Amino acid sequence: MIKIITFTIVTSLTLALLGCASSKQPTFGLELSSDYYEFIQPDFARYVEASTQWLRENRSFIGEDKDIELLINSPFQLVPTEQTNKAALLVHGLGDSPFSFSDIAKSLVNNGYLVQVLLLPGHGSKPEDLLLPSYADWQHIVDHYTSLLTAQYDEVWLGGYSTGANLVTINAINNEEITGLLLFSPGFQTRTPYLEKLTPLIASVINWGYRTEETNFARYNSVPFNGVLAYSNSASIVREKLTNYKLSVPVYVAVSEADSIIDPDS
């Protein structure tokens, strides 16, 4: 979904400056809001249960097989066959779903890691729900389930794609208990940072950046500007922290040199 950020900002800039619409402000502490569900749970199993129930009742299903769509979009955990002291938490990107980490999660569990894959608030149900969360909600869920893992396992790796990579990097900078990072196309900075700076202005007056028919079971085709704003906030914060602090853990980074949106040199 990050790949449409530039398009949505450019096409909506004129309307934004005219102030032709108003945006619903995201609620801090979304897990306590009547608009959403309690995604902060005392353990991961109850989180998966609460998330799946929310999706079952609130997802705008695309096809006839609702069970498959629920499976694709729900957070999940993979447990290795033998007892382990190693764990990994994986976080998807803007507009995406836990399904994006299905292959990597299988590889990690086959190498002896307990693997947990999050569903970021606002995802998996319908694009309109991305009008609800803020960056703080996304960081809160990552920090919470990371803390549960570090309390139980000696070795904890965090992995993320795009926006998810920003969130786990921010946690690792502040968390001495993290063993290492797995970053896939980290969204530290786009190739058009001057357009990224306009996101707060546009998000304050326009709800939708790009809206179209939803045809993909595993990710949104449409994106509200509130979701783009949450990404932009994560990018600004991770850049600031990386300027002032150095990571002291191993970091694996995978990024395409030809990426049209993310700056591979950032």
At which residue positions do the language-model features occur?
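Short, surface-exposed "cap/lid" segments of acyl-processing enzymes
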Residues: L71-L120
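Conserved alpha/beta-hydrolase "acid-adjacent" motif
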Residues: S260-D265
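Catalytic nucleophile-loop/oxyanion-hole region of alpha/beta-hydrolase
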Residues: S125-Q152, W157
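A conserved short beta-strand
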Residues: E177-P193
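C-terminal motif of bacterial Sec signal peptides marking the signal peptidase cleavage site
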Residues: L18-G19
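The alpha/beta-hydrolase serine catalytic core
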Residues: S34-D67, F188-T243, E257-A258
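Gly/Ala-rich beta-loop-alpha elbow adjacent to hydrolase catalytic centers
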Residues: G160-G164, V168
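Short beta-strand/loop motif that positions the catalytic acidic residue
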Residues: L247, V253-V255, D259
